Amino acid sequence: MKRATRIPTRRTTTTKRLAGAVAAALLAFAGSAAAGPTITFGKEGSLTFNYSFQGWAQDRGYTSSTDSGRQTDFFLRRNRLTFSGQYNDLVGFYANVDAPSDSRGGDDDKSIFFRDAYITVDHSDELRFIVGRFKNAFTRENLEACFDPLTMDRAEVMSYTPWGGSRDTGVAMWGNLADGRFQYKVMASDGREGAEVAKDSPRLTGRVHVSLLDPEFDFGYRGTYLGTRRVLTIGAAYDYQKSVAYRDFVGKTDTVDYKAWTADVFFEQPTSAGTVTASAAVMRYDTGKAHFGLSPDPNLPATTDLEGWYVKAGYLLPGKVGPGRVQVFGRHERSEYNLPSGYRDQKWDGIGVHYLIDGQLLKVSFEAAQVKFDVQNPTNPSQRDYKQYTLGLQFIF
């Protein structure tokens, strides 16, 4: 399995740039570990296809917010078809269609939609642009490829911004400086929109990171490089949107701005005794305690004023066990929602193992998790202590 390690700088040969750009697009967002079939057009054009699948079997201590009975569920966590490539030496493109969580909770035959669709313009390694719908440039974990995770998956909530979630529509400028040791991202996007918004202003995001060992060149990251790099990266980001909500929704007064910050660190060190991976982050979303206003906006998400942190670690055994490799992992996270009820505040702990039959292209994973709430909600089983067990199969072509 061949992996691209960096995005090439501008005006390398067309062949090198074409191959590098396709690989970079796949690694940045799809989470695909290798390119699928590629069709070339002329001297500079190309189109690459990818199929990525995650099937889960999950046993959970409740069924829904109204049903406290234990549930066993089989569903498609992710089910994506990706199209990516180059129009010419300067302009590239990427799109994927997805039907996530199909069959989860009895919701079968979900409609597919474009999860990502964007154009890239690569002027140089120091100056690149993305236009369309793509990943938010705020938290590291959201930018980590979902098909290259260290744990079973990302955090269920805290890594996604309240206004935009995992993706948003807009434009980003980014680049690598000092031979990739320093990276910057600047993004302007829709953020919160709609009639309930006090003022329709753009959402502005800025992110930087410093790589002290091997550089992380791509717009996105990986949760683990499976021992192919020595990485120590420190990152930080800020997110802002003006006048996103009213604290007095009925009277349409007392507007509040949205502000958020995050800081993170990622470390991976391969040794003869195996590969150690560790990552941690803290994030704070602040919308002026809008839920505590005179008449709060009923459309505000629960994450409006969320603050939290996580730590996660993994160990990849040095040799094969049978036909594949074994990676064990653990995760702890703490989240406080700052809601009047206090019901959602929680601690989340999980341990698990990946059996990598062909790297990330074909693997089986298992995770056992326990969620404990500070305050037990007497009417909502999803906000009471529970345990969860997940078995997953991942395939990428």
Indicate residue ranges for each PLM-predicted region.
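Outer-membrane beta-barrel pore domains
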Residues: K2-R3, G42, G61-S68, G106-D107, ...
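Repetitive helical segments and hydrophobic/amphipathic motifs
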Residues: A25-L26
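Bacterial N-terminal signal peptides that target proteins for export
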Residues: A4-G20
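N-terminal signal peptide c-region/cleavage motif recognized by signal peptidases
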Residues: A30-G31
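Outer membrane beta-barrel
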Residues: G36-E216, R222-T224, T303-G319, R325-N338, ...
